[in-house]
Amino acid sequence: RMLNQNEADLVYTLDSHIYDTNYINLQEGRIGVHFVCAANHPLADRPSVSLKELIQQPFLLTEKGMSYRRVMDEALAAKSLEIRPVFVSGNTDLIRNLVAQGAGISFLPDYTTKELIAAGKLKYLQVPEMKVEIWTQLLHHRDKWISEPMRIVIDYLHKCIL
């Protein structure tokens, strides 16, 4: 919407894939996202966990409507399921650290958890019933002229985060 109304020159998303012929997709990439728990959690070493069993666990989640949380909620709703979290925060670092301490389970992008996974403090839960795709995309409106400052920002984003 912001691109269509010329309220933004560029948009960098972390969400479900956006398909729109009005937008030029400058860069995109699929982002891994998993349910995670503490390494010593009873579900941690299971080869797979059912959704019905999983949603009975205490959950620490990002705020409702936030990109990957919204995508997860929609996927669960399609199965007539929902998670009622015991803790909600916009602070992903806080959530992942609480999960690592055994406070519950969360659903987070891999780039936020890979450090604690590598350190053996968190584990990914395998939930075969839940296939969710999260994408990063750098978009601009098809009719938008790319100014020199925009080109500099685009080049910076390509070097640093894309």
Language model: regions and residue ranges:
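Short helix-initiation/N-cap motifs at beta->coil->alpha
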Residues: 1, 88-95
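Short beta-strand-centered segments that line the small-molecule binding cleft or hinge
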Residues: 1-33, 37, 100, 123-125
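Hydrophobic residues within well-ordered alpha-helices
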Residues: 2-4, 54, 97-103, 138
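A ligand-binding cleft/hinge motif common to bilobed small-molecule-binding domains
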Residues: 14-22, 70, 74, 78, ...
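Short secondary-structure boundary segments
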Residues: 15-17, 39, 110-112, 128-129, ...
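Flexible hinge/capping segments at coil-to-helix
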Residues: 23-59
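Secondary-structure junction motif
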Residues: 44, 58-79, 146-150, 154
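A late-sequence structural motif
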Residues: 123-162
